[in-house]
A protein has these predicted regions:
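Glycosyltransferase catalytic domains, chiefly GT-A lineage
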Residues: 2-324
Length: 324
């Protein structure tokens, strides 16, 4: 399979790229999430060059329907991939990113939301940079049981000191980094064949250890992994969600649900509003900024404000009527 010509940074030469790898099925959930994430980058880093790598099947789908993600990004690249499910195609492209985009790159998973300027992250990095998985302080906190199972089945014994998350990372393009990606892609393919699972984090961490590339563990603020416990949210540069298209339990999910139906101007204003909140509240309406400050104050109205922001309007009204 021949490789396409890499995307170059023609319009914003010299700046690092912000990159997404987007694949989709009929639900279009991942392109919708990537749209919200890219709009947040437009707010945080207006000069960023946003580039999206697509497999051919997804590219045809998104172009046929004129998905707004294609308008928000600066460049897209369609790459022929082996046949497979959307996650397989995504990982196949992601683990070879320097093949598709030249220069220095910040990669973001689709389920991320950037709140503050993120490109200054490159001041920390000379090779490859990523944040500890789960924002954990110890390996026991960082390595998920499924990832450990994957490593055991592959008989990998990587002597890493930190196990990083594969959803937000950056690199300065160099020969050691390209070797890192070659090891990552090869390890991921072998892992898929051996285990039948598409997890890419075990092979990434193995590659970081084996490649000899300079690896920086970045400050946790560059990838605050939300999960179900919102810790470190106010100080985050990037919120990273484990998104479920069914459960609209935070602002990012609500924005995603309206990504293709909302007026573009209204959607941008909502993205800008959410970026200023201390947490991704599930009810980011026009009152959100005021109520966010109120709940943070710890004053008499803070409980009511928090309930409203969490979408618990009936609870709030009931508590008000009871004189709580």
């Amino acid at each position: 399979m021949s490789s396409p010509e890499p995307i170059t940074q023609r319009e914003k030469k010299g700046n690092p790229s912000v990159a997404y790898v987007v694949t989709c099925d009929a639900r279009l959930h991942y392109p919708d999430m990537a749209l919200i994430s890219a709009l947040s980058v437009r707010e945080s880093d207006p000069g960023a060059c946003i580039q999206v790598v697509l497999d051919r099947e997804s590219a045809r789908t998104l172009r046929k329907m004129a998905h707004p993600l294609l308008e928000v990004c600066d460049h897209t690249l369609d790459v022929e991939t082996p046949q497979g499910a959307e996650i397989f195609r995504n990982r196949w492209l992601k683990t070879q990113l320097p093949e598709w985009i030249s220069g220095d790159v910040l990669y973001l998973d689709a389920d991320t939301f950037v709140r503050r300027p993120v490109l200054p992250v490159f001041a920390h990095v000379s090779g490859f940079g990523a944040v500890a998985n789960h924002n954990g302080k110890t390996l026991e906190e960082q390595v998920w049981s499924e990832d450990r199972r994957n490593e055991l089945e592959m008989q990998w014994d990587a002597q890493y000191h930190t196990y990083v998350n594969g959803g937000v990372w950056c690199y300065r393009n160099s020969e050691p980094v390209r070797r890192l990606f070659a090891i990552w892609h090869d390890g991921w393919k072998k892992s898929v064949l051996t285990t039948g699972r598409l997890r890419d984090q075990p092979s990434l961490n193995r590659a970081l250890y084996e490649s000899g590339a300079d690896v920086t563990v970045l400050p946790g603020a560059y990838n605050v992994q939300a999960g179900f416990i919102w810790q470190g949210m106010p100080d985050a540069v990037v919120w990273h969600f484990y998104e479920n298209p069914v459960h609209l339990n935070n602002a990012f999910a609500r924005l995603t649900a309206m990504a293709r139906t909302a007026d573009p101007g209204k959607l941008r204003r909502m993205v800008a509003r959410v970026a200023k909140l201390s947490a991704p509240w599930s009810n980011p309406d026009m009152l959100a900024s005021l109520l966010d400050r109120m709940q943070a104050s710890g004053g008499a109205g803070s409980v009511y404000a928090r309930e409203w922001l969490q979408g618990q309007r009936r609870h709030m009204l009931r508590h008000l009527l009871r004189g709580r």
